[in-house]
Amino acid sequence: MATRLLLLLLLNLAHLPVAGAAEPGYPRARPLTDRTFEVTPARVERGRYLAEHLLQCFVCHSERDWNAPGAPPVAGRKGAGTVMSERGDRRIVAPNITPDVATGAGGWTDDMLARAIREGIGHDGRALYWGMWYRAFAQLSDEDLAAVVVYLRTLPPVRNALPPTLLPPEELVENAKLPRPIAAPVTGPAPGDTKALGRYLLNVADCAGCHTAWEAPRNAGLFGGGNEVGRGTRRAYSANLTRHESGVAYPRETFISVMHSGKGGSLHPIMPWIAFSGLTDADLGAIYDVLGDVYPVAHYVGNVGEPRHCDVCGQEHPLGEYNKVQLPQSVAVPEDVLARLPGKYFAAEFDWTIDVRREEGKLIARQNGGETDIELIALSPTRYFGSGLLAPLEFTLPASGAATRIVSQELDRVVLERVR
């Protein structure tokens, strides 16, 4: 869901309103509390595992040695922050999160850190830059959040004064709309539920954020790769992680080995395998298992060779010439079922509308009042593939009457209720 909210922000940035807020950059936020997190050896170790590996904190909040395999943090600079990019009136800075009082997080309370990590609110009340993964970290359990804060307090303090992040005024206004306060308890996956664990890990690590082509002319599909990601002047296209021959079609053990070693295909150092290499076999296996539930996408993506046009994502990237849009074989659907599917469906959280109609015997969908027709191809009488959609759509049919909702079969199912 974090990535869907990011997509909504990107769409808003494409249609920017005139800035008129009295205090741009200040979002809605819950008040700070005086809570503190108890320090225990178990929490410190759990926090280290999360911050160094799953959450990849030091991939952004450190200067990195791009001449070393995997581009690890520069020795002695872990967590000291860095200027990630600077161009014109836009500067993106990952701040110093070491306990240095003068230039880092040493003067921040536990709740300031917790609110920043999970809710995207800086210690001064401003919204953090939307590229910080707090929308993914929002799904961190309360205990894991406490562990991360406790661990960050153990880092050696590093004196490193950095300039602030700067955003153009219009983007600053839009950026402040994204944070959402968290008041209710957040729990983690139940012990022993490996599928729930895999979803938790994928969500918190925001794997779909990089491995889905959110901004491409055509979305190849969830985890279908082709997203251009970068750090400074370095650019790479993310890999297809679905269980297709063009993606992660190899065995579980091979996936785990690749993630530990960084050796597989054309793995690029922008992909933070240096962090993921420290994940346990159990966690990597849980991730692999859940990726097997994602609809397979035919999309070859590489980072070696000349960029070529790709029909699947509409971009140019290495191996792009090997890609053609592949449509599934439609199954027969009874007429009385088809007649119950047309209607208007809406998900308020994402301001997402799907209009479904019948036309010349076909089921056609349009999103958000647009003019692009998407033919829905039946995978079953109630489950449909749409070219360019993030995931298949499942219609909910009662015993009689029209369908009541559509469920987009993403990692976290997104429900669109019938409104007409």
Regions found by a protein language model. Give the residues of each.
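Bacterial N-terminal signal peptides
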Residues: 4-17
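Electrostatic cytochrome c docking/interface patches
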Residues: 26-52, 175-203, 329-339
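The canonical Cys-X-X-Cys-His
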Residues: 47, 54-64, 113, 148, ...
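C-terminal capping alpha-helices of c-type cytochrome domains
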Residues: 109-123, 136-162, 252-265, 275-302
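Peripheral terminal and inter-domain segments
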Residues: 324-420
